[in-house]
From Swiss-Prot:
This is Uncharacterized protein PA4219. Keywords: Cell membrane, Membrane, Transmembrane, Transmembrane helix. It is a multi-pass membrane protein. One of its GO terms (cellular component) is plasma membrane. InterPro entries: PepSY-ass_TM. The chain crosses the membrane at residues 22-42, 60-80, 81-101, 231-251, 271-291, 303-323, 328-348, 355-375. It is found in: Cell membrane. It holds the Pfam family PepSY_TM.
Length: 394
């Protein structure tokens, strides 16, 4: 399983299938509510769009940074929350309403959404088939605004075999799952065409959720796509900083609370939030070190859930003064660095270089996590005693 697919599955469903997808969508609803609460709480700060007091202590600097990211990134945060919530909850609504819309045949709703299956095989061998390069060239001429991304064959050795070209259409927010052209494999005759442009308004809006949520802006053209993907990445990193700074401020405010329930909630927040980062980093490291025959199995999801649960269990069992968050973030940083080294080493031994973007990102994340853990350790260390000079009793 490639690392990108692994992270995508983690983001979509936490490796627990459709229930996990619904759960993740509920976190999208939570993000929308947090945005609303943040706007109400920080409504007086709209006049301080550039204030960041970095010279008056870490807590005040993080407070200002939290407000700045929330204000400047609010449109993207709302986009992340709304599209994330609609993705899973919309699928749940489709599943629940299918028996109402088609009482005799509930599965028909998925045929209406995704299109009919390819023509069935006739059991006769295919004597010759059209050249696929010529078919792609003809499809580009027939549909000039269509950009092919995926090609799949159905019943390739049968006379009824077909080929499907899936892609995107310029100016139409959709994905290759909904923009498809099907041709007969024998002679290249067009058998059918599916597009979100043929759907109603609400269905088109639902289809547009995925490209907007996952920064799939190819439908806008190369220039706009690259710019918006970069902005999307920056806002995603900003959202991570927003969560981290908000959690830190919340924990600091309740650090000295005498209530045992508050201390337990504080401990669980450290375990599950920092544990999520550590489990994801260790999963990436395990992906690099595991044998190839294990990559297609269910172990990545199980490993992630076990590691995350172990972090939550540690929050309950370890002493209250044990630096749990610091330890988990340090482990996550080391795992990110080790994963980058494990990926780069085989390439360097062959005298070649892979695409360095993912590895540089892992190295940067690892360095930042280790630095943060080190700064926490430094802040928690007792001040050094001043050296005694002279006679204080003189």
């Amino acid at each position: 399983m490639p690392a990108l697919d692994l992270l995508l599955n983690l983001h979509k469903s936490l490796f627990v299938g459709f229930p996990g997808r619904v759960l993740v969508s509920l976190f999208g609803v939570s993000l929308l509510l947090l945005c609303l609460a943040g706007v109400l709480l920080h409504s007086r700060r709209w006049r301080d769009l550039r204030r960041w007091r970095r010279d008056r202590g870490l807590r005040l600097a993080l407070f200002d940074l939290h407000g700045l990211i929330g204000i400047w990134g609010l449109p993207w945060l709302l986009l992340f929350g709304f599209t994330g919530a609609l993705s899973g909850l919309g699928a749940l609504g489709t599943l629940l309403l299918a028996p109402v819309a088609y009482p005799q045949e509930p599965n028909r709703v998925f045929v209406e959404l995704m299109g009919p299956p390819p023509p069935a095989a006739e059991g006769r061998p295919l004597a010759s088939r059209i050249d696929l390069d010529r078919l792609l060239a003809g499809d580009a001429v027939r549909a000039p605004g269509f950009v092919a991304q995926r090609l799949s064959l159905s019943h390739a050795g049968d006379v009824a075999g077909s080929v499907e070209i899936a892609g995107i259409r310029r100016g139409l927010p959709s994905t290759a799952n909904f923009e498809r052209h099907r041709y007969r494999l024998a002679d290249g005759t067009l058998l059918g065409e599916r597009s979100s442009a043929q759907r109603g308004f609400w269905l088109r809006a639902f289809i547009a959720v995925q490209p907007l949520h996952f920064a799939q802006y190819q439908w806008l053209g190369p220039g706009w796509s690259a710019a918006l993907r970069g902005l999307h990445l920056a806002m995603g990193l900003g959202a991570c900083l927003l969560c981290a700074s908000g959690l830190y401020l919340w924990l600091q405010r309740r650090a000295s609370a005498p209530d045992a329930r508050v201390r337990l909630l504080q401990r669980l927040s450290q375990g599950f939030c920092a544990g999520l980062v550590a489990a994801a980093a260790l999963l990436l490291l395990g992906l690099q070190l595991a044998p190839s025959e294990l990559l297609a199995g269910p172990w990545p999801g199980r490993l992630f859930l076990v590691l995350w649960a172990a972090a939550g269990l540690a929050a309950l069992l370890l002493p209250g003064d044990w630096p749990l968050a610091r330890g988990l973030l340090g482990v996550a940083g080391l795992a990110c660095l080790a994963a980058a080294v494990a990926h780069l080493a085989p390439w360097l031994m062959r005298g070649r270089l892979p695409a360095l973007g993912p590895d540089l990102t892992l190295i940067l994340c690892g360095a930042l996590l280790i630095r943060h853990a080190w700064m926490q350790a430094r802040a928690a260390a007792p001040p050094a005693h001043p050296r005694v000079t002279g006679d204080h009793h003189a």
